[in-house]
Design a protein with these regions (language model features):
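Bacterial N-terminal signal peptides that target proteins for export
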Residues: 4-32
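Extracellular/periplasmic juxtamembrane helices and adjacent flexible linkers that interface
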Residues: 17-20, 30, 284-368
Length: 368
């Protein structure tokens, strides 16, 4: 790679904001980068009394999330604060913490006092259920089963797509090398793996033996199996490794909005990457914030809030945002699977990502 190209892709690396483990971030992290960052959004002057009774007392909410939806939250929160102030006469202050979904989940389990959790996958929310922090019926209690934003898997390619990569099948070609995080350490990488698995099943009439053969061949072409998505981004964009990188489509769109010059493909056979939001029941009852926390979660599903998610690259979730103007912005996905098609995250985690499961078998085949 020429020096000029390296500088260009270095800029892209700064723009592509993935999930990653905050311990991997050592230096030069901006306020919009993905690390374990803690920022406070002040709605208005006042104290931070946790009471949720209507009146002059202020209330503070702690919103903990994986890093990707931060920009959307930053746009949505002031709208909710204004509405709540008008309806209840209360000033709401948000403390926000963002980082890798897995690390944020562990932090909540270990005592980070989240009132609301917006994580990368329902499997992480289920860990909060197992820890006794979230009601086991959280999906039934939350609109749309808790899914508040959705995207698909995208293949980021070199400028002009010189290898003519169009589908996940192309990642198994002998002339294609690619980069991805390790599904054993990265929540986002688990979506990547399932996207490839889904594609292989669809092409082979549900034959899991052939699907295993495909993913094994594809992962044999992985030049960097990074511990987290930030490391994968750096390997692809800064170090020039590989011909392709799998990322969330919304992240690529957001990077392009911020000036990054990059190309991507959204394969027509894809997986719906559904990100859940939940009230952390034990904490809201402890803090006395249930009323406002539940109201904020409900607000996230309003057309006004959903429009902000769509502006930042998430695919339309409801009928109000599923307009021709919005849908025309996205490449057509003709065959879209959901995690429910594979039994839900609990079953997927056991079948694919537990020790000795399908992913480990894939890597073992790769090493043979």
């Amino acid at each position: 790679m020429k020096f000029g190209q390296a500088r260009q892709w270095g800029g892209v690396a700064q723009s592509l904001r993935f999930l990653w483990n905050p311990r991997s971030v050592r230096k030069s992290v901006s306020l919009f980068a993905i690390g374990a960052m803690l920022s406070v959004t002040i709605a208005a002057c006042g104290g931070n009394n946790a009471s949720t009774s209507s009146g002059s007392k202020d209330v503070e909410l702690t919103l903990v999330g994986y890093a990707v939806p931060k920009a959307a939250h930053d746009a949505i929160i002031p709208k909710f604060v204004e509405q709540w102030k008008k309806e209840k006469g209360q000033t709401v202050t948000f403390t926000q913490s963002y980082g890798g979904s897995g690390s944020q989940t562990r932090a909540i389990v270990d005592g980070l006092g989240a009132d609301i959790a917006h994580l990368a996958l329902a499997a992480d929310t289920d860990k909060l259920v197992k820890a006794g922090l979230v009601n086991p019926e959280w999906q039934a209690k939350t609109q749309n089963g808790g899914t508040v934003a959705k995207t698909v898997a995208a293949i980021v390619v070199r400028p002009g797509n010189p290898k003519n990569i169009k589908t996940f099948q192309d990642l198994a070609r002998d002339d294609v090398k690619w980069v991805t995080p390790d599904p054993k350490t990265s929540g986002g990488a688990r979506w990547n793996f399932i996207a490839l698995w889904n594609d292989a099943l669809k092409r082979n009439n549900g034959d899991e033996t052939k699907a295993k053969e495909f993913v094994a061949k594809a992962y044999k072409n992985v030049v960097v199996l990074a511990k987290d998505a930030r490391e994968a981004t750096d390997a692809f964009a800064k170090q020039g490794q590989g011909d392709a990188l799998i990322n969330y489509e919304n992240e690529v769109i957001l990077a392009k909005q911020q000036g990054a010059k990059l190309d991507y493909v959204a394969p027509e056979t894809n997986i719906s990457i559904d990100t859940p939001v939940a009230v952390v029941d034990k904490n809201v009852d402890k803090h006395g914030t249930r009323e406002v926390a539940e109201a904020f979660v409900k607000f996230l599903f309003t057309p006004e809030a959903q429009a902000e998610f769509v502006k930042l690259g998430f695919r339309p979730l409801d009928t109000a945002t599923t307009t021709k103007e919005n849908t025309d912005k996205f490449p057509t996905v003709k065959n879209l699977a959901t995690i429910k098609d594979f039994g839900g995250w609990s079953e997927v985690q056991t079948k694919f990502f537990a020790d000795g499961a399908v992913f480990d078998q894939t890597i073992a085949t790769d090493k043979q």
